[in-house]
């Protein structure tokens, strides 16, 4: 009893002590918390993904975002602590503390940066105001030198500030604290801030993702005016709905000055910190944000990315729990609302054109994109001035949503080129594994393979294999060449390869989400047909064999993802039974089912999965499991049919049959139909589809194909027609009439007569109209009655006649002197010409000749003056029958007086340019021909002598040849001086040339021409040669 009282007293004392400690903790409040409590970071859980934001661009390619928040784990949730605001109630036991009015100071002091001064943003929507910085702080200009590598190829001759800003007068009323902080830094107007920074979101590429925090938010107390210290990272972008989350990236840009031009923006636009600079909690608390629903559009029409507003951690409530989650807090994907108009430039061109009004190196340029870059430079805004050979990096990153390169799928986001993964998320890096699972590691892949060695059934198409959807790395091949053909059918029996009794050529065939390669090697190679595809397939396909001989054996294999369903739920795989089937993971090896050679399996399946463990469900107990005990009756009495498996609930322990309530109803396998085979059915006639009618209208004929078929266990097949000889043979032709043929219809009345008097022609439109009233071709009415006439003669009565004449010709027939002018005169009958001979005008129906107007008259352009001109004759024939030659023509000076021409002295035409008298010409291609020299002197002066010469065959280039025709070879000898000797010259033999003595000296008397010209001189020479002794 005393022991029990002692224990009771001890429990009471411990309870009182515990109450006292709790009261002291409540009185002290948060001011006595240890630093370890404040700095402790609880582990959180990711909340669900939010909705995808709207596309960032109204047309073309843009970016969509969605985010999730890191929430405190439910097991670590703490009661809310009293807020630290002056208007909040104080803890018990403490009075109100006096509030000292003072300007709040920034907890983050930005590092000095070479380009750009302090940035300013508009007032926040939660009550903050912005201090107006004096304009004197903007009077400094960038004076940094140009560094190597800043420009592209080509050289800049001298270094100047890239952009000139107007010097602003320094106002004396500038605050000291701002001037001291700015005088050491070059100032830059807000208008030169790059648009890419203004619009770039805070994101984390997957290759650089780190742990990010998304604490719950607590907005600052409204109503208090806060003065912000200017900071490069203090103001949030004007187009963002919320402060940007913490990023783990470091600013990769140099803190030194850079003369790079910045994207021009509107004056006073808000600036966004670099997306890769670290953001602290103090920065998050000092960023103001634009209320949702007020996006800001840049001047060039390019929309920035926006984010949905969500609560964030607040500096003014440091006691709020700050959970930490690992993983990404934001995802992005490409989007496109509608294509941009063709006349609108691409985004890069718009961004480059924004610098057309901004000076660079002291002058203005028209900028166009420069895309001949690689690597990380693809997401920089590199622009080239038109007509110049250098380019400039205007901004370090293009606007989000810009394509990395024209025609690529990669998109620039925050200066990084991100590629879409198989899940559509930019930068996810997910790729399908070997069995088509997006982001899979291949652990779920299973290789299914086997050999089909059954001899086969009847001739024709026979299904041999079923391939499920999602299969990849397919390969089906025959063991050796044969007359059989592999065929492929898709869902609904749609033919893919070798369908409709037609053999397709080898090649590529696209179907069910992949491309099948059909290969048929020559028989001498000793290889059979092959079907292969990389996959994965989007729908199941059936593999058939067109049997024309016994099956030589078929090997098949494919990779598929392991399905959680039981093997009995899979559709039938084969009708020709396989010799072997493997269902095993790709990485670990599994035992293969062993079967005695020569036996056949009824169905080829993945090996049976062991029965599941005892798991009780709401639909039934685990006392039994479903076991297949047989099949129903076959649905066909002959040929091929189907039956369904019968499942019973069997005890797991004793194997006895139980009632169905003892097994889980949801785990009962479906009774999928399976193929069954009965004895062959009697043959029957199978008629094909009727062909089109032989005529498009009227009676015609149709034909169809008739086959004798018989159903076997493996399916239907064509058999010889003799087997169906005892059956009545259906007709293979029949009469048909699609519609009545067309008829002729008059569609317009008669036109006016072609003449106003006399006999003429008139016409009307006649068309062939079908049964529906529409016009058809004339051949549709060819079988009917002839068409009504469309033309006929018409008589407009007698015509009145009169002479009609035209104007005189404008040119006189003579250039000078008297000439003739002509005009046309006709006799018309009410506007029509008189038919027949013009003399018919003298008849009663013609015009009287006595009143015919004259058709000629004299004309004169003035007296004629004598002129001279060169007259050229026709060119002569080419001097050479082949090869190059010359042509000549006669040129004379002719004087002209009126129509008279006289030949005169060439000196009268000397003032005129003389036409050429010679010109080169080209004959036909020269063939090899005979050439000969001059004849030698005659060997005797009388009583017959001999002359000789050389004869050679030369080619067109004057080289010796042997291809000249022998029958055209000139003779090498000829007789000469056949006159008798001792003849005195008669009186008729005289010299007709004064140069005969020279002819004698030159010994030219041997030639007939000179003998006749200098007869006497040559006769004396002949006499002297005869008198001289031999």
Curated annotation (Swiss-Prot):
Which parts of the sequence belong to the TSP type-1 domain?
Answer: 47-91, 681-740, 741-800, 803-865, 866-925, 926-982
Single Gene Ontology MF annotation: protease binding
Q: Which UniProt keywords apply?
A: Apoptosis, Extracellular matrix, Glycoprotein, Repeat, Secreted, Signal
Q: Which InterPro entries match?
A: ADAMTS_ADAMTS-like (IPR050439), ADAMTS_CR_3 (IPR045371), ADAMTS_spacer1 (IPR010294), PLAC (IPR010909), TSP1_rpt (IPR000884), TSP1_rpt_sf (IPR036383)
Residue ranges of region Disordered? 73-150, 168-306
Task: Report which residue ranges the record marks as coiled coil.
Answer: none
| Record's signal peptide | 1-24
GO CC field: extracellular matrix; extracellular region; interstitial matrix
For this chain, the Swiss-Prot or TrEMBL PTM comment says:
Glycosylated. Can be O-fucosylated by POFUT2 on a serine or a threonine residue found within the consensus sequence C1-X(2)-(S/T)-C2-G of the TSP type-1 repeat domains where C1 and C2 are the first and second cysteine residue of the repeat, respectively. Fucosylated repeats can then be further glycosylated by the addition of a beta-1,3-glucose residue by the glucosyltransferase, B3GALTL. Fucosylation mediates the efficient secretion of ADAMTS family members.
Which superkingdom is the protein from?
Eukaryota
The residues that carry sugar chains are: 451, 731
Give start-end positions of Polar residues composition bias: 176-186, 211-237, 245-257
Q: Where in the cell is it found?
A: Secreted, Extracellular space, Extracellular matrix
Keyword field contains Magnesium: no
**PLAC domain sequence ranges:** 985-1022
Subcellular location, principal = secreted
Give one GO biological process term. extracellular matrix organization
Instruction: Describe the subunit structure.
Output: Interacts with CTSB. Interacts with FBN1.
Provide the function of this protein.
Answer: Positive regulation of apoptosis. May facilitate FBN1 microfibril biogenesis.
Indicate what this protein is called per its UniProt record: ADAMTS-like protein 4
| Species whose genome carries this gene | Rattus norvegicus
